[in-house]
Amino acid sequence: MGKIIGIDLGTTNSCVYVMEGKDPKCITNPEGGRTTPSIVAFTDKERLVGDIAKRQAVTNPERTVFAVKRLMGRKGDAPEVNNWKTHSPYRIVAGANGDAAVEVQGRQYSAAEVSAMILGKLKADAEAYLGETVTDAVITVPAYFNDAQRQATKDAGRIAGLDVKRIINEPTAASLAYGFDRKTNEKIAVFDLGGGTFDISILEVGDNVVEVRATNGDTFLGGEDFDQRVINYLVEEFRRENGVDLSKDRMALQRLKEAAEKAKKDLSTSMETEINLPFITADQNGPKHLMMKLSRAKLEKLVEDLVDRTIEPCRKALADAGLSAAQIDEVVLVGGMTRMPLVQKKVGEFFGKEPNRSVNPDEVVAMGAAIQGGILAGDVKDVLLLDVTPLSLGIETLGGVFTRLIDRNTTIPTRKSQTFTTAADNQPSVSIHVLQGERPMAGDNMTLGRFELSGIPPAMRGTPQVEVTFDIDANGIVNVSAKDLGTGKEQSIRITASSGLSESEIQRLIKEAESHADEDKKKQELIEARNQADGLIYGTEKSIADLGDKLDAATKSDIEGKIEALKKVMDGSDLEAIKTASEELSRASHKLAEQLYQQSQQGQPGAGPEAGDAGHAGHAGSAKGDDDVVDADYTEVKK
């Protein structure tokens, strides 16, 4: 088995770690960053991922997709998605299967497909770093992700060419990294506020055991919402001062988004920052500039209710764990938003202790994922991880009631069975409606799937015995089966993302991703060949200029002809033609190099009697050491 990489697939940024021996190591991207923006952009010619996609977002807002994690496993008409549509510069639609998708240049991309593009970039960066092919990964998800969102994440990994060995909850991964090699037993709370999601997990860590006691959260609360509050404020202030509504201008909104994110970060360390966006828009009177000061106090006033929304899940998680805030030994902060002083203050007040900031909030989740990869590969020994399912699972029963089979915060993997019966006389089949959630009525919870158990022999209602079994694997993914105990007939369903990608669609997207990988490789080879050709032309032309009249006309004409031939093909896309022309010019330029070398030797003092009238005769031996120096007669030439 090769290396298993650990990936934190974040809303705003993603990060990759790998175990090197017993130590987790961050894999930097080619740009030198330890995290990679979770952004994909489409241009007329190519697809861009990461930093390069982020850099061009202002000039290409409608084709630059960010925060796609917020759409994973969600319906196109879900309230959260409809809310996100109002702020998003790119187009969000309901796909053919009803799931949220993005539409760029007339083509629809599922959230899993866009996430796969990000994962593909992370995979390629890991391969470049390790110098070997990477096929296995552990990918993290928010603890409060439901089954559909987990399955969509796993599908994204498959499309990117990764065998996802384990889906692990982000706070659990963070606690794994925090508790790695710790011997003391502690009850910890992992407060994880990232770019798009919030999780709180209560765990017991120590003596190489990490046990999740309870988890809670909000999968639509994060840094993107904080940025949006700042954007709304800037738009309103600019409208009040200039009478211009920037919210209608997508390019201006993208500039505002970048400025809002930067201001938010700046205010974590300073009390005031200045937002300066020249030429943000124009009207009949000319260009308009946005220049505004934003204080930390104003920012905190804008977002205080968002921070307060994190407290209730903390309260619920503690109650589910059967603990009080005073019984928590450490509160570990995870996610970039926990750098905000107001967040740290509110967390400290709720738990009654100063939060622990000893871990890197941007990297600790990926580090934990890599440690989990090491456990699965057998490289990390004697570490036991006990995770939980975040939401209750059950089926719909008579009267539209949600009957739980597995309660939330049950340790996984787990298996639970319960026997049900028919609701009518001579009922030939039963429909099993599988649900996930906490509401008492089935209609208020999320549908994971439906299947039919047919062929039940005619009998009075209440007579047939149908055993329904729920099985949750270590990834938190659900399998459900129903068995007629009278006939032994059984029917089962592996719950996939609700109305999600079919197997044939996944296979098609895998092939497309592989094809893109080949295209990207060829494109990279073409760019490298062009760069080498450009360098060769520059060096050869410089050599010709340096030699001047000392280069005979025939040689000069031959080389210049080869330079023109290379220039003609290097802007094209024929890689072999560029390589051939480069090789021909390279061979010809060797003669130049020889002549240039001889010329440089002749012009230097100590090069011999031919060095020129003003030169001295050279030493007869080399000067490697005193023993090798040979005295020689010399004649002083007087001018």
UniProtKB/Swiss-Prot annotation:
It comes from Nitratidesulfovibrio vulgaris (strain DSM 19637 / Miyazaki F) (Desulfovibrio vulgaris). The keyword Phosphoprotein applies. Belongs to the heat shock protein 70 family. This is Chaperone protein DnaK. Residues 628-639 have a biased composition (Acidic residues). Residues 594-623 have a biased composition (Low complexity). The modification Phosphothreonine is found at residue 197. Residues 589-639 are annotated as: Disordered. The gene is dnaK. Acts as a chaperone. CDD domains: ASKHA_NBD_HSP70_DnaK-like (cd10234). InterPro entries: ATPase_NBD, Chaperone_DnaK, Heat_shock_70_CS, HSP70_C_sf, HSP70_peptide-bd_sf, Hsp_70_fam. Keywords: ATP-binding, Chaperone, Nucleotide-binding, Phosphoprotein, Stress response. PANTHER family: HEAT SHOCK PROTEIN 70KDA.
